[in-house]
Amino acid sequence: MDLPAVPSSVLEALQGSARSLGIPRLALVGGVVRDQLLHQRWGRDWSGVPDLDWVVEGDTAALVAELSRQVGSERISGVQTHGSFGTVALQLDGIPLDLASARQEHYPAPAENPVVRMGTLQADLSRRDFTINAMALDLVTGELIDLHHGQQDLASGQLRLLHAGSVADDPTRVIRAARYAARLGFQLAEESHLQIRSTIQQWPWAWTHGDAALSAPPALASRLRMELERLFEREPWPQALDLLEQWRALPLLDGQLQNDPERKLRLRWARRLGLPLMPALLLGAADPVATAQRLQIPGKQQQWLQQCVALHNWLADTPPCLEASPSIWSTALEQQGWQPEAVALAVTLRPKPWKPLLRWWGRWRKIQAPQTARDLLAAGWQPGPGMGEELRRQRSAAQERSR
């Protein structure tokens, strides 16, 4: 299998270093193998080489040292070592490489972080999420290793979980399934679809909705959020969210999100207003603030959600009348101390008086008094409450003129 845009000098240097040390396996793994097969055999567009992920049956630190000895340190840059298994990131001739020792893992409890130990390439491939991501190109032998029939699923456009306990072990795989299916245009294999639905219905995890938010295991908390962030940042997210809804998988986030008819409108408004999509999505949850805490979204976004919920309740109780002037609406909103993003999030909910909120977000809040405190002092005003009142009066008048 050829690797376009990867210089042969890079491959030869890695191959030579592995052979010098007697390393039995040095294999390219992950999305680059999948995408290159799709390109070569099925004519998919080649989007260029991402970071290259390699699995080593042996000592990665020793391999990097031998590589440096053979090619010279001037060709290698940015060497960083991470973790107890000697994962090494570097650049060889400007090409990013990530090398990791082969490993195997088991889950001490569903949705907890796995326990990892050294293993073989075969074990490393068997711990992955989908058959199409569990292939490897062995640089030492030139062999394409496909233990789980990933090529067959590529040919048929199927996305298949690797084993029967995949979702129970790591529910973030469901979000990844939606990401890949939306990006590649693949169909979820029937048994994988059944596994997702039945696992979520059975709910094998120790934590459940209503429990303390911060007691959720990582794959139902921060790691679930990270997959959602990747979905919003990298993928055709409207299609991916539709798939999660079709698979009845949104209860992983919150049961109410599974039946959320306003989701698409909320997210369209959030994008239009330049807001992060995550808090707009979570506004459809039964308890948006608790869900945000569990997923550990950024603190400022949690604050926006808290304020948005408070604003929504305020609108239901004692808002200004719909026909109130710009200055009255501005004063009422600003006295509450709500951040602008919280008001914009409230717009995505389309409450009955949503237009004044939108106008405040887009225009009224940005209007300033035509004069500054320095101007008033120069005109003979004395410092004190009266000067502040005059500046507020001027700003209100300017807001009224903006109707």
Regions found by a protein language model. Give the residues of each.
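Catalytic cores of the polymerase beta-like nucleotidyltransferase superfamily
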Residues: 1-403
